């Protein structure tokens, strides 16, 4: 397990909604890549227990999506709270990237960071203050070179580990087809 300052930490959360003042994290997954986006390790994929009362606050889209994926059942059966999920995730990350070195990486990652700040501050603090947000490139490509977007295929399972893998692949796609190196 080579600890390396240049490794990148990718994270995805599934939540009961988009408002960190009202909604909660129900799944977290992480993976680590090297600086060239080769996946080095996949961290734990953790369903986080939330009460039926909290789950009942989900809108129709979240109920439909997270029920179809099996996540709602996994959340109900989980014995993990946010603190336990943070401990497992930090233990994994410490083997790959020193604290404060990696930007937080993912798609629309600012949204995830808002939830981390609210519910998992120790994990949020592990990241460098910078962001590596793949959705920035998606928005630029949409405006500057929209024809390349048709070559990008995503499954949109809204399962945390699948979503991270797709984010890494999406950044690699933009590197090949959009960014001139």
Curated annotation (Swiss-Prot):
EC number, UniProt record: 3.1.15.-
Pfam families assigned to the protein according to its UniProt record, in alphabetical order: RNase_T (PF00929)
UniProt KW keywords: Cytoplasm, Exonuclease, Hydrolase, Nuclease
Keyword field contains NAD: no
GO biological process, one term: DNA metabolic process
Record GO terms (molecular function): 3'-5'-RNA exonuclease activity; nucleic acid binding
Root EC class: hydrolase
GO CC list: cytoplasm
Residues annotated as the enzyme's active site: 129
Domain Exonuclease: 8-171
SUPFAM superfamilies named in the record: Ribonuclease H-like
Compartments where located: Cytoplasm
InterPro entries: Exonuclease_RNaseT/DNA_pol3 (IPR013520), Oligoribonuclease (IPR022894), RNaseH-like_sf (IPR012337), RNaseH_sf (IPR036397)
Record keyword Chaperone present: no
Family in the record: Belongs to the oligoribonuclease family.
Role according to the record: 3'-to-5' exoribonuclease specific for small oligoribonucleotides.
Official protein name in the record: Oligoribonuclease
Biological source species: Sodalis glossinidius (strain morsitans)
